[in-house]
Amino acid sequence: IITTLEQAERDRIIINSKKYEERALAPVVSAMVGGSPHFPSGYRLKKQTDNFIWISYDTQFTSQGILIYKYPVVAGKQMMGLDEILEENAEMLKNNVPGMFENTYMMTSTFARPSIKYMKYKGRDFAEIRGFWEVYNDYMGGPFVAHAFYNQDGTEMIVMEAFVYAPKYDKRHYLRQIESVLYSF
């Protein structure tokens, strides 16, 4: 029953996201990964490189962000395992998501090992990773959920990671909102 309720809420958020979509973001993401989630109004592009995009919805007290990145598949190497995904994730975060101070950057928390679950949604196989992020050498952190999957021709891994920073608030609602954006891909 809980899964059914979560799916109904996710579908409601996706419908709303499509209705009030921040349309300028779709071409940016599509150019890099061949498709795009539906970003609700208010989301803004924070950073873009050839293989990395950071999109965020920020308020005075909260931040909901989505990191989208890709990297080449290495022939003969397991690419969908948790350790392999986290290894690439560590490099992407360190190079692209700086903290507020020198020698600070976003990283996957080592406090609790993230979990991985293999799923199929709308015909797409993907690995869902859940865990916590933190800022190296600083006191920020929160939950994240990521979807990792192969591109259409199987030559690249694509990772879409949704994260929440809301130090004064319960993060469940914020995470479910932004997780719905991932499912709209």
Tell me the role of every PLM-derived stretch.
Residues I1-N16, P37, Y43, M157-F185:
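Surface-exposed amphipathic alpha-helical segments
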Residues V28-G34, G42, Q60, K120, ...:
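Long alpha-helical, hydrophobic tracts
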